[in-house]
Amino acid sequence: SSAASDVYKRQVFVGLGWLLYVIVAQKFMTTKMSEISIYVTIAFLILWCGLLLCLQKSGFKKSVLAFAVIAMCFSEVIVSDCSSILITQGNSDYKSNYAAYRESIEAINKKDSDFYRTELTYLERRMDPSYYGYNGISTFSSMAYEDYSQLQYNLGMFGNRINSYTYNPQTPVYNMMFNIKYLIATPTNPTPTDRYFTEVYRNKDKSAAVYENDCFLPIAYAAKTHLKDWAADEGDPFKVQGDYFRLATGLDGVFVPCGYTDCSYDNLSGDTCSENGTFWFNKSSSDEQYGTVEVTISPLRDGNVYIYLASPEIKTAEFSGDGIKNTLSQNIEEPYIMDLGYHKKGEEIKVSLDAGSMSATESYASIYAYSMDETVFAKGYRLLADSALQVTDWGEAHITGTITVRENSYLCTSIPYDTGWSVYIDGKKAETFKLGEALLTTTVKPGKHKVELRYTPKGLAIGAAVSGTCVAGVAGYLILVHIRRKKQQSAG
């Protein structure tokens, strides 16, 4: 019939439309797409269109087609889940440190009732803060703020720029910015540097220890308004952190670039890496299974050395040399800042990049290595600590405290910007804005102030009004029905 023919045409055109969309989409591949996912999507499109066309033909049994539809749904879910879920550890490993971490966390809670963040020096899973029950910075959630995730990535955190970022021992500047007060480490995981952390608790069986940040800042503090010029662009995370510190305090040079004393290639050739930045290299054939790049760096002053490595092809890096007892290794597929420990001026650290797994004949690596100027950092920290919020009360949706400010300043927080957050200074609502495209910030004048931060989910008032109206409407309808029945019974 003409109607059936129209249905067939619509289904064919819709199927062709989706097929065209997939073909166009594969021209703009993202990190979440692959050639296999494109082919599987096309295959499912063809199968779904075929099933829908079969449903229009009377010759096919509806029960058989219904079973086929259910089977298709399950197949699609199985294919999707199997390709996206990666099991990295067994159940026993998953919970092996639970008792140790819980003892340490309970010791912290007993010692300190203030508002702060705690972290592990090595996270076994993205959601360790939820699993172990502590207030951390790490998260992996569909509700995470993408701008905040991007900022964390730009600051040198392990993450995906979208909805996940994971803490690894960071610089004192980062720990100060993001309210990190305690770190917990097991004997097999990295120990925080004693230059900035003090051990305050050790489990009875020595299964874990707690370290307190000597340069802790509360959730909010006053900083110079020059921060309006802060550009938190992706690239060199030390520049992003250093610019924040400079603009917030007026002190420059908290990070000092390391010197580069040597660059050598084994079974590769490439640029000479002589300073922080990006350098290119290549191998004679993509079939070559061996090749290394070795860069030697040397701090220009005493202090902790931090390094950040990124490459689209290199997966692992190793660090050895003066002051490093055992060779350190790092997976740089997802780059993040690594603390190489305290080193004296002139010591040499060898950075070895394994290029054996390169699938291309040419690639590049970005390397940024810095040491800390402890004197500059200490001065800047004291400036910010003197104008930090003294938290007096806090809960799930509010933080209250007092602050003393010397000059017109920004009231900076490590809270993700959300229009649901309201800031009240001395009872008056202040205008909030984004800092670094992600952080909740407002302005504050000189003097002593009472500050209150309140959170109300966006749309709560409208949602409550709509729900209340609906409830009232249903109640009114039921009352009218009840009255009408009464009248009918009386009339009868």
Predicted features and spans:
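Short, charged/polar, Gly/Pro-enriched secondary-structure boundary elements
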Residues: 30-31, 215-222, 448-452
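Central hydrophobic cores of alpha-helical transmembrane segments
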Residues: 10-16, 65-72
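Cytosolic-side transmembrane helix boundary signature
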Residues: 34-68
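Juxtamembrane "helix-exit" motif on the non-cytosolic side of transmembrane helices
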Residues: 20-31
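Active-site-proximal, structured, solvent-exposed surfaces of multi-pass membrane proteins
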Residues: 262-492
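A cross-kingdom signal targeting lumenal/periplasmic-facing segments of multi-pass membrane
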Residues: 142-278, 282-285, 296, 312, ...
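Short, small-residue-biased leader/transition segments that mark boundaries at the very start
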Residues: 3-8
